[in-house]
Structure formats: structure tokens, C-alpha cells
Amino acid sequence: MAIMKAGRVKEIWRYPVKGMAGEQVEQCAIGPAGLEGDRIWALRDNARREIQSCKFRPELLSCTARTRNGSSSPQVDISLPNNISSASDDPEIHRYLSELVGYASTLEPLRPDAELDFYRRHKLDDSTWLEELKATFSREPGEPLPDFSQLPQQARDFVTVPGTFFLVTPFHIITTATLNHMKSLLPQADWDVRRFRPNIVIETDTHKGLVEQDWIGKRMRIAESQIDCTATAPRCGAVTRKQQGLAFDKSMLRSIIAEADQNLGIYGSISKPGTLTVGDTVYID
């Protein structure tokens, strides 16, 4: 199969705490668990005994998490509203975050994949959890939802893939072509990339439209790393949420549903580790 030049790495993002705003970096190691330092902490609801995200706790988007010493430390520093600075090793962080989201919660690091109960989904019965999940997609009457009948059993039983704080796969990709295409359809909206929480933004010079959707089933090569493009990324209500510097705006979600078949960006899994650097050429084969 011919190798195609797709563009270059424009931005690299990681989100040390699940659901919080993250940090932009110039270079980062990548392996089977995704970018080094990405989603290494998460908030866990004490009563539900369940990992939380900005889908269920949108208040998390008002916080920013940064790796300490360039991810050489397992601890992360956190900026909260009202100019509060804290950290994962600050005993007060659990109180701060509980007050922020309105529920008693604990900031937790990753645990081994064998600790299944830690990652388990809260279920009152066989249907309530699914209705809660559907509600996070913030659909209006008549708008389609993703096909939840195809959810694998693991996704039905666990909030994240055990051993990780990822919903599906550890890597999320979006292109400037897609953002520019959506901007052309809805120019009054602010298509700021932070709303979509990608790990990399690929700048495409000549490609136009929703180009990454055509990469599903193909392999991406960046420097020595290889990333398998595995699935589309259906969008939920998180993209509409208010966060630092971004106002609440539901118009983008309406446009994504109507014009992009509910999807923006794609997911990937890492088949060969390496190091990503801003400016790296991206190839697809």
C-alpha cells in the first residue's frame, strides 16, 4: 500500500487529570498507554464508587492539570477556580474538588487492571446506567444517538478500560481540515480545539473536509511511532460546556450531528512506541 503524506503535527495535548483542561507540549513520548502523563489521575465519586469525567461533572473543565517536572513525577499540579492552586499530593485537593462538583469525591491515581471494581460502572439496574450515558450526549428531539447496541461488554461493565482512564482507546486525533470545514459551515461558532480534547492536531495543507474519517482502518506513522486508526469519535455534550476562555455553545454540537454524522476526529491505538514532536511529518498507509 502506498504511503501518503497527510500533514504535520501542529499541536500535542495531554490531560493529566481525566475531565480537566490539559497542557500543550512540544514533545512527548508515546506508548501503549498513550502519551506519557495523559489521564493518570481521575476523580472518583465516593457514593457511586465510580470514576467521573466532564461528561457527568462538567465543573471539572474549570480546572487545569499539569504534569510536574515534565511528567518525570507521578504528581500533578492543579489550578482551580477562584485562583486556588493545589496538587494531587495536597491533602486538601479532595475537599476542593468535592465542593466544586457538589459530590463527595476523591482524586485517585491509576490502579492495576486487575482491580476491576475500581473501574466498574455504577449500575442501579440494567437500564438506568444506559439512560444516564445517553443523557450525556445532549441530543435534542429528533437527533440521532450513537448505536449503543454495539457497545462491547467491557464498556457496559466499566466506565473506562481497566488499567486506564480512557473510555475507548488511549489516543485521539483531529485535523485542521476538519476544524476548518466545520468552521466554514458554522462560522459564528468558536471551533477552538480545546473543546474537542485531542492528543494531536494534524495540520493538513492540501486535504480538505473530514479527512481523518477516511483513515479508519489505516496506520499513521509519526517519526518512529505507529498508530492504528481504529474508530470515529462520536461527540457528546462536553463540547458545548463552558470552560476557561470558552463560553457555553450548543450550536457546534448541532452542526456536528447534522453535518458530520455525529463524529469529529478519530481514535487510535499505539502499535509502535516512539516520541512525538511538534513539526513531525505525518504519514498514512
Which residue stretches match the model-derived regions?
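Metal-cofactor-dependent catalytic cores
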Residues: M1-D285
